[in-house]
Amino acid sequence: MHSSRRKYNDMWTARLLIRSDQKEEKYPSFKKNAGKAINAHLIPKLSPKMNIMRSSCGRQEISQFQTKIRLFFLPHSCGVNDVTDLGGKDDELVGKRKKWKTEVRIETSMAECNGGKDFTEMTRIYLSIRKNFFQICLKTHSPQLPLGR
């Protein structure tokens, strides 16, 4: 295990692996490091090319640890540095972008994490393509510590 995992909240998985079928764009298999599966049918389709900015699957909510998680997908080169609620601007961001770095915003509501404290801070997930699977790294977002590149 990586020593950097200590940075992450114990209630969250530092790393999730999403398996993606290269031939058939089926729902990927979401697995936590602990081995608990996340309901894959609640997750939008993820194609190997990361073409997931569509009105039908741009926003999804999944429940994990009894927490509502909302996913916001935006391309790496859209010019938006901060992950905010894009409203109806999803289609505008798609454009003709070829390289995608999916940035995901997690909203937690009434979540009890970190020894019972309310986990109200934003958590960012970064998906990066690693051959046949996507790697998700969770990091707590601090206002004075902007994440991403």
Swiss-Prot record:
It comes from the Eukaryota. GO terms for cellular component: cytosol; mitochondrion; nucleus. This is Uncharacterized protein C191.10. It comes from Schizosaccharomyces pombe (strain 972 / ATCC 24843) (Fission yeast).
